[in-house]
């Protein structure tokens, strides 16, 4: 009975170990794009197609490399690491911004991590405030209930007045419509004779 229990645990561990091995075959896409642009050295900037060719020829990349490169280019444009010389979005020509992109990208990542940490810390501070508020909530709920009870008769009165108006207006319209029909019938009858 003891032998089958430890067997599934080692089977699960190699699956977890495989995931980090895959990205180790090549550097990050942002680093590869920077290397491709540096290698191109064209005045007009390097196109996405040339970047893709360089990355595929120099690195072991998966099937979805083109899509990853496109996404990475967009990210680098938004962070200001790349400058677009021609075109719009991920299509066009690109240059590295002033200074090496490789130096800037880790700094950008650190800033993002710091920003993420800062965003989490105010949330923690807000949680104890929420814990205090439930004592106030029942009073507020009681006030809301009173307001609703006061407001509800007003709402009930309004539809009654609307119905009364609609009935009054509808009656004369019917009477007016019936009269012209009678006249039209009288006019038509002499023509038939």
Curated annotation (Swiss-Prot):
CDD domains: H15. Residues 1-11 have a biased composition (Pro residues). Keywords: Chromosome, DNA condensation, DNA-binding, Nucleus. Residues 1-29, 80-193 are annotated as: Disordered. Residues 25-98 form the H15 domain. It is found in: Nucleus; Chromosome. GO terms for biological process: chromosome condensation; negative regulation of DNA recombination; nucleosome assembly. SMART domains: H15 (SM00526). One of its GO terms (cellular component) is nucleus. It comes from the Eukaryota. Its main location: nucleus. Histone H5 performs the same function as H1, being necessary for the condensation of nucleosome chains into higher order structures, and replaces histone H1 in certain cells. PANTHER family: HISTONE H1, HISTONE H1.0. This is Histone H5. It comes from Anser anser anser.
């Amino acid at each position: 009975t003891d032998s089958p229990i430890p067997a599934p645990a080692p089977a699960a561990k190699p699956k977890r170990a495989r995931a980090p091995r895959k990205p180790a075959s090549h550097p990050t896409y942002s680093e590869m794009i920077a290397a491709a642009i540096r290698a191109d050295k064209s005045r007009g900037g390097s196109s996405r197609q040339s970047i893709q060719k360089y990355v595929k020829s120099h690195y072991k990349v998966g099937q979805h490399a083109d899509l990853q490169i496109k996404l990475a280019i967009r990210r680098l444009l938004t962070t200001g690491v790349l400058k677009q010389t021609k075109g719009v979005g991920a299509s066009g020509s690109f240059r590295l911004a002033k200074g090496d992109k490789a130096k800037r990208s880790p700094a950008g990542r650190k800033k993002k991590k710091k920003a993420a940490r800062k965003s989490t810390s105010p949330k923690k501070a807000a949680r104890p405030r929420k814990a205090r508020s439930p004592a106030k909530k029942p009073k507020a709920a009681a006030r809301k209930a009173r307001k609703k009870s006061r407001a509800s008769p007003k709402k009930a009165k309004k539809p009654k007045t609307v119905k009364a108006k609609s009935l009054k207006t509808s009656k004369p319209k019917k009477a007016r419509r019936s009269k012209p029909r009678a006249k039209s019938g009288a006019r038509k009858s002499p023509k038939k004779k």
